[in-house]
Curated annotation (Swiss-Prot):
Component of the cytochrome c oxidase, the last enzyme in the mitochondrial electron transport chain which drives oxidative phosphorylation. The respiratory chain contains 3 multisubunit complexes succinate dehydrogenase (complex II, CII), ubiquinol-cytochrome c oxidoreductase (cytochrome b-c1 complex, complex III, CIII) and cytochrome c oxidase (complex IV, CIV), that cooperate to transfer electrons derived from NADH and succinate to molecular oxygen, creating an electrochemical gradient over the inner membrane that drives transmembrane transport and the ATP synthase. Pathway: Energy metabolism; oxidative phosphorylation. Component of the cytochrome c oxidase (complex IV, CIV), a multisubunit enzyme composed of 14 subunits. The complex is composed of a catalytic core of 3 subunits MT-CO1, MT-CO2 and MT-CO3, encoded in the mitochondrial DNA, and 11 supernumerary subunits COX4I, COX5A, COX5B, COX6A, COX6B, COX6C, COX7A, COX7B, COX7C, COX8 and NDUFA4, which are encoded in the nuclear genome. It comes from Oncorhynchus mykiss (Rainbow trout). One of its GO terms (biological process) is oxidative phosphorylation. Keywords: Membrane, Mitochondrion, Mitochondrion inner membrane. One of its GO terms (cellular component) is mitochondrial inner membrane. The keyword Acetylation does not apply. It is found in: Mitochondrion inner membrane. This is Cytochrome c oxidase subunit 6C. Belongs to the cytochrome c oxidase subunit 6c family. It is a single-pass membrane protein.
Length: 10
């Protein structure tokens, strides 16, 4: 998700 580095970054 967006802004979620722990879940994928972009």
């Amino acid at each position: 998700x967006l802004x979620v580095p722990a879940m994928g970054g972009l």
